[in-house]
Amino acid sequence: MKGIILAAGKGSRLYPMTRPVCKPLLPVYDKPMIYYPLAVLLEAGIRDILIIIPPGEEGPFYRLLGSGGRLGVNITYEVQEVARGIADALLIGSQFIGNDDVCLVLGDNIFYSLKFGGYLKQALQHREGACVFGYYVDDPRAFGVVEFDAQGRAVSIEEKPRYPKSNYIIPGLYFYDNSVVEIARNLEPSARGELEITDVNLEYMRREQLHVVKLDRDFVWLDAGTADSLLYSAQEVKRVQDATGIYIACPEEIAYRRGYIDQKTVLRHAAELDKTLYGRYLECL
């Protein structure tokens, strides 16, 4: 399986912060926002990663992540010249995907749970079709809402419904088999001129191949797309890290635990950050 991070948004809801710096490179507490979706892919065991970025941002991304060698993975980049919707990432990445399955994660979504690895394993077990996650919210009217049966099969999806059929929404993490490329190619733009990821999921549901993994109520999902949510996300990351002593979305730690890099490499990274708490954390792995 390959992984795609869609990190090409202008971040207009974060202006003027994102005029000089693109949104995925903004800090969320102690690390760049892009580390959070990257950590998800690493935790899922995905080592071939494509990051879709805005025009003119190749330099900053490459200075931060390079080609992935420091994490023992392969990272490549593609530019989304014009914002055409989330599903456009599947077309931009079609050559990268090739004959493989793919995991798509949004660049401003933050996921945290001590049981996250187990949820990812559940999603990866569905080798045919697609798998999304069901996240409980009290008021789902501003989101894409999914209804599913006792077997975890989606039975309805509604985008920002006035009267939701469930309290479960779909966060920005999607697992697809290889037929997703064909599905994306056959999409028609929506009324707002975009290729909607909801339409991709609806097609899988029509084929009775859309699976839903229900997340427990203690699972943390954050969308850091506005100034308030960015601040709240940073505060939550700090709160959890201070309380547990475990860093959220530390790519070096995940790569080390999975055997992608050795301790010598971790210590070299730690030495580069020796004046920071992040560097000291790496020293103790």
Write out the residue ranges for each language-model feature.
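Conserved N-terminal catalytic core of the sugar/cofactor nucleotidyltransferase
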Residues: 2-5, 13-16, 26-27, 31-106, ...
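A structural signal for short hydrophobic beta-strand segments in well-ordered beta-sheet cores
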Residues: 25, 146-148
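Glycine-rich beta-alpha junction loops
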Residues: 57, 109-111, 136-139, 161, ...
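A short acidic, often aromatic-flanked loop/helix-cap motif at beta-alpha or helix-coil junctions
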Residues: 83-86, 139-140, 163, 220-221
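Catalytic-core segments of class I nucleotidyltransferases/pyrophosphorylases
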Residues: 103, 117, 121-124, 153-253, ...
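Conserved donor-nucleotide/metal-binding helix-loop-beta segment in metal-dependent transferases, i.e.
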Residues: 113-141
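Short, amphipathic C-terminal "tail helix"
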Residues: 261, 266-285
